[in-house]
Structure formats: C-alpha cells, structure tokens
UniProtKB/Swiss-Prot annotation:
Keywords: Cytoplasm, Developmental protein, Differentiation, Gonadal differentiation, Nucleus, Phosphoprotein, Spermatogenesis. Residues 96-108, 115-128 have a biased composition (Basic and acidic residues). Phosphorylated. Testis. It is found in: Cytoplasm; Nucleus. This is Testis-specific Y-encoded protein 1. It comes from the Eukaryota.
Length: 334
C-alpha cells in the first residue's frame, strides 16, 4: 500500500532519478529513496512517479519536480528583496542616463542654432561628426540653386563636346558628298545653260521662296543667268552662293556672292558683295531698300546680314540647289 501511494503522487523525468537518490542520501535522518522500477515495455526517458528533491526541511508531500523549480515560493524573501532592489536601481539608472543625454542634446541644439541662423548655406554644406554629408535645405534655397546651376553647367559642357564632335563628323561627311556630286553638277550646269530662265522659274515656283519674291524681284530675276553653290575652307565650313546676271538696268555686278558659315545650328552670314548701282538718282531703284522690315529677295541679295536671311540661305543651298528640277514648273518641261 505504501508503494502504491508513492507511485500515485508525482512524476519526474528519467534523467532526474539519480540526482534525487543522491540528494536524498545526503539529508540527515532521511532514508534513501529508491527509484520505482520501470514498468516493463515502457521506453527509457518516460516520466515515472518519484519523490521530488527538497533541499530544505523534511519531505512532507510529494509534488512534481517541475513545479518545485518554477514555483515562486522556492525563492527566499531575501532574494526577492534583492531582485526588486536591483530592478528599481536599473530603472533609475536608465532614466537618469536618458535625462542626461536629453539635456546634452538640448544644449548642443541651443549652441548650434545661432550659427545655423547666421549662415544657413554653411549648415547645408557641413558634415556631421560621422562625416556624413548633409542634404541641402528644401524650398529652393541658395545651396540648392547653386547645386542645380553646377549640374546644368556640367551638362552644357558635355553637350558642347558632343556638338563639337558632331560638327566635325558632319563637315567630313558633307565634304565627301560634295566631292562625289561635283561631276554631276558640272554636267547639269552645261545642260541648264540651254534652258533660258531656268533658275528664276525654279525659285519663283518654290513654295517658300515665292512668298518673298515681289513683282520687282521677278523683273530682277529675269536677268539671272545661273546659280552656283560651292563649299570652300573646310576648316571653317564656309559656303558661297554665286548669282550670275546679264546686263541689266539695276547694277553693274556680273556676279553677286553671298558667303555663309555652316554650323551645327544652321547658316550664319559672313560676307556679301557690294552692289554697284546704275544711275541711282535717275532710276531710284535703291528706294526699294527703304522698307527694311520686309524680307524680299532683293533686300536679302543686296543687304548684308538682313534679318531672316539665314532661312533663305538654307532653302537655296539645302533644297533648291540639289533639287532644282523638282521645283521647275511642269508645264515648261520640254
């Protein structure tokens, strides 16, 4: 009966059995506790009914060892007081440390605030103690504007290099094309000489050139014999237009030239012939130049750097000169 009561009280893991027997033998006046035999067929390590280890005092009741280890009453009162005191001390130390850091932070902010107000740009460009670069202030301040301008200048510098390389490549390609087309242009010149007024009709029939040709310009163009375009000075990429005229009542020039410099942005006039007028007092044809606000073929031909002349040069050299037959009136084809 005694063994049956002992087996019905508590259960301890297999690994604690030897420890229970050893500790029980050390207690004065307490008989050694024999571990209950393992039931047949039970695997090793299963929980068995044993008496727990009680370090202080006589063994009165049998309770599970796990409950003894985790029970709050196993700690003595002195230990509980010590643990409570340690917790309070730790909280106080953490609180004091936080207040101390907060006070140091407030003092540092108060010391830096006047300097930041005096020189906000320096505050944007300065680095912290760890060497991390601070971001510029938002809102379009001086530091941000300066950064944007520096970025824009750097981009413009890169674009200048690209434009220079493109200009050089474009000039080389254009020179090769001009050399290949020259024999064909020479043959075309010979053929056009047998077609009276060819260039004048092609110019007046051009949709963009016709808008700047007045009635007086048509009369002037009736004396035009030929048109030639040549490229010279490859280093400066210069182009020259030469207008050949027969004897006429307006000027003595047999050839009127217009020189332009070709760049990546278009044509820029550099020089033009000086017109030798015939009988300005009698004919008064120079009075047509009084309206300098209107762009006409005569104003463009006879004036130097007339406003809008770059567009006319572009039309003649890039469109009319390589493709004159395209603009020659169809009904005049023979």
């Amino acid at each position: 009966m005694e063994n049956s009561e002992e087996e019905s009280v508590g259960v301890a893991p297999q690994e604690f059995r030897e420890l229970v027997l050893l500790e029980s033998s050390l207690l004065e006046g307490e008989p050694s506790v024999q571990a209950p035999e393992q039931s047949p067929g039970a695997p090793a390590g299963d929980n068995q009914m044993v008496k727990p280890l009680v370090i202080c005092g006589p063994v009165e009741d049998w309770v599970p060892l796990a409950e003894v280890l985790h029970h709050p009453d196993t700690c003595e009162e002195g230990d509980e007081a010590t643990m409570a005191e340690l917790k309070v001390t730790e909280v106080v130390d953490v609180k004091n440390e936080g207040e101390e850091v907060k006070d140091q932070k407030q003092e540092g902010e108060q010391d830096q605030q006047p300097e930041l107000e005096k020189n906000p740009e320096q505050a944007c460009d300065s680095k912290d103690q760890q060497g991390i670069q601070r971001l510029p202030l938002s809102g379009g301040g001086p530091a941000e504007r300066r950064s944007k301008m520096e970025e824009l200048e750097l981009l413009q510098l890169e674009l200048s290099f690209v434009n220079a390389r493109c200009s050089g490549a474009f000039a080389r390609i254009k020179a090769k094309v001009a050399k290949m087309r020259r024999p064909h242009f020479d043959r075309r010149k010979t053929i056009i000489q047998g077609i009276p007024g060819f260039w004048a009709k092609a110019m007046m029939n051009h949709p963009q050139m016709s808008s700047i040709i007045s009635n007086q310009d048509e009369d002037l163009l009736s004396y035009m014999l030929s048109l030639e375009v040549e490229e010279y000075n490859p280093g400066l990429r210069m182009c020259r237009m030469m207008f050949f005229f027969s004897e006429n009542p307006y000027f003595r020039n047999d050839i009127v030239t217009k020189d332009y410099q070709l760049s990546i942005i278009g044509y820029k006039e550099s020089d033009s012939s000086t017109i030798e007028w015939i009988g300005q007092a009698e004919h008064g044809y120079a009075n047509c130049m009084q309206d300098t606000t209107r762009l006409t073929f005569f104003n463009w031909l006879c004036a130097h750097k007339f406003p809008g002349s770059n567009r006319i040069a572009e039309i003649i050299m890039d469109d009319l000169w390589p493709n004159p037959l395209y603009y020659y009136p169809k009904e005049d084809h023979s």
